[in-house]
C-alpha cells in the first residue's frame, strides 16, 4: 500500500496533508493512528517552514511518501530547502525531554524520535533533503 503527495510549501498544504494522512490511517486501520498523524504533521511543518525561509521565486514542492508493508509503515518527506546541516543532526537525535525549553523551535523531532522505531536524514541531489521514519505496526 502506498500514498504519494506532492504539495506546495503552504499552510493549506499542511492542512491537506493532515486530512489525507488521517483518512489513510483510518481507511486502512493502521494502529497508532494519532502518533502516525502527528509524526507526518511535524515532518511536513518542518519542510514547509524550511522552504518558506528559502524565499524561492519559482514554485517548489514537498513530497510526502507513505508505504505500508505487512508490519512496517515508512514515511519520507522530501523538500528543496537544503536540509539540516550534518553537524546538527546528532544534536537533534540526541536531545531529551530534560533539555526541552519552552521555545517554539525544535520540539517536533524530540517527540517524533520517541514515536518511531527509526529516523534518518538524506541529502539528495539539487538541494533536495529527505527525512524518513519507520514504525513497526501490528494489527
What spans do the regions from the language model cover?
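Bergerat-fold GHKL ATPase/HATPase_c domain
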Residues: 1-38
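Short, highly conserved beta-strand within the GHKL-type HATPase_c fold
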Residues: 65, 71-76
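A conserved short beta-strand within the histidine kinase catalytic ATPase domain
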Residues: 57-66
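Glycine-rich phosphate-binding loop
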Residues: 101-116
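Glycine-rich ATP-binding loops of the HATPase_c
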Residues: 117-125
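Glycine-rich nucleotide-binding loop
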Residues: 83, 125-133, 137-139
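Conserved ATP-binding N-box helix of the HATPase_c
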Residues: 31-58
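Glycine-rich/acidic phosphate-handling loop/turn and adjacent ATP-lid/helix
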Residues: 77-103
